[in-house]
Amino acid sequence: MTRFIIVTLFISLLTAGPDRPYHTTPDREKDMIHMLIDIEVDIQEGRISGSVSHTFTPFSSDCKRVSFDSDRIEIHGVSIKGQALTFQQNGPKLFVNLDKSYGWEDTITVKINYTSHPTMGFYFVRPDSSYPNKQLQGWTQGEDTDNHFWVPMHDYPNDKMTWECRLTVDESLSAISNGELVSVTDNAEQRTFHWRENVPNVSYLLSVAVGDYKKIEDEWDGIPVNYWVYQDHDRNDALRSFGKTPAMLEFFSDVTGVRYPFEKYDQTIIEDFMWGGMENVTNTHQTDRTMHEDDVRPIHSSDGLVAHELAHMWFGDYLTTRNWPNVWLNEGFATYLELLWTEHETDPELAEYERLGNLGATVWADKSYRRPTVQHYYYNSIELFDSNIYAKGSVIINMIRRYLGDDGFFRGLKQYTRTHAANNVETTDLKKVFEVTTGKNLDWFFEQWVYKPGVPEITANYRYNRRSQLVSLTLKQTQDVESTSLFKLPMVVVIDDGNINRYNIFFDKVEDTFTFPAEMEPLMVGVDEGFQIPKRLTFEKKTDELLYQLKNAPVPNDRIWAARALKETRSTKKIHSALVEMLSAEPKWYVRREIVNTYQSLKPRNGAADLMAAYDGQDDRVKRAIISALREYETDDVKSFLLDVIENEQNDYLVSSALYALIKIDLDAAKEKFDWAMEQESHSETI
């Protein structure tokens, strides 16, 4: 499930502390083998009707009663081989009294006939008088535990099974589900689609998507790859959003050491989706907002979303968390493989910049609602889907990589995927594989980063001794070690004394001083080069060193740190001139965007002219930052500039940003554009 979380689920529903109930993996009374769903989907009535048959073996030698998760579902009857069984419904549970006592060696199939009008788990989209152009759709969203609101089932990720779906829908619609399409049968004004998933998986990954779809076919290495889009989309539209999928399949198969393990890979767009995407096994649901025209690139791209959801086919689907407290194993790996794709396909330094964003989200989450990554205390498991599993999860995996090195990390990653293929996993499984593969004891690492909350708070300062030609770097950990940890921190210190010198240190004390040789007083000293570790760093530097670092640090993330640090300095012409110079000299667009943000925060008197002069030739993402910065300057020149952007730029997001800026500086001028703006068709109605 993608990380488009609304204010991180209201800051994880404010807190996630030990005052909440403790949760661990629930016991199982039976081992699920197969599930056969045979239903009619009535979108207009919002109704599911039919049956589900569960095949399982008991764990006990005297099994007389079994239960299924079933909430607000009308049960018409339960049977074994046509023989009716008695049953009771109690809250979210359906209890079934078996016809006799069964043992662990028996295989049982229980059939449940039912009707549901679900308000969760299965959603219906219909056109109405307010939105006459809406699609007619029905689709599922099972994660975390919502599928049992529309079909009785075992609804927890500690068991895997195969399943089939026979879906009867209106003859004008298609019904897509997991696995292979076995058959399509035409009935009177209806069609029945029979799908079968042959690889055992957890029930929240069950997918049903019903709608008026067009299938765009693709393939990778003999595996069908399909894009289910709307009738007004063509092949180019589908490929614009999803066309890199085959290359991603190739890359992820290589990096995990496991060839894509399922029958096919479909991506189905849906309307009114509450998330960005959902990694239902072999049939990912994607928000239809990801469809776009070329004009909105690079501000909008589907690549990250597509990579994230596809990565889940290995981490989340093939290997699935055994319980919700360990769900970071799903989301952290998917988020990190998204970065690996950027590193592989685009630019390793851009991937590092994206990782810097995850690092920032990790620190923000810790400040807002401190909790460990593996969290057993919660009211509802959906509370856990926050930055601690997505952003921090990916940061943890990156730190493992940096500590073990690429060779050890990628060998361990492949061994982890192969060892636990098609199984459930917990954090201990990952830790053990990396320890066995590399010989490293990782107790300390997982204890401080996974099982305990918090991030280090570090103050840094240094002195240079000209006589000894030594730099003395003093580091202090200032966090409350009682509530978090005294962190063990392997880091790289970079010193520029006319030459770039890097030194590996291991900082594991409250305070420590490290010395390094330097032939002259350093032009720049950096702690944790590239910012690999989530932390709050206080490192006061003189303006000249910050400007030098902005221009000369070899790693873009360190140049970004300098740009951000300059926001806290006194605004001077020297700084303004340096920032303007770097808007053209800096090679990376993402560093230039940070420079624009710094320039805006310093509010130079002639800032508008400098920003407008720097606009042409910039990456659209930098242009958008410039437009946003111009909101601070209410002048006729800026108004004319914004009107020119509105009338001539092709990227919807630039036009939208210019309109918002114009509202702030000249509301009357913006009102004159209102009718025009309302008539524009734009991506996600951004204009």
Over which residues does each language-model region extend?
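Hydrophobic alpha-helical and helix-loop surface patches within well-folded domains
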Residues: M1-R3, V52, W195, N226-L475, ...
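Long, helix-rich interaction regions
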Residues: S12, E581-E594, L602-R605, A609-I687
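N-terminal, polar/Ser/Thr-rich
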Residues: L13-S49, N133-Q137, P157, G439-Q448
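Ligand-binding face of N-terminal immunoglobulin V-set domains in extracellular IgSF glycoproteins
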Residues: R47-D71
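Solvent-exposed beta-hairpin/edge-strand motifs
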Residues: C63-A84, S172, P490-G498
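A surface-exposed beta-strand-loop module
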Residues: D71-Y131, K509-E521
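Extended, low-hydrophobicity, Ser/Thr/Pro/Gly-biased non-transmembrane segments
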Residues: N113-Y213, E217
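Non-catalytic accessory/interaction domains
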Residues: V169, A311, D407, H420-A609, ...
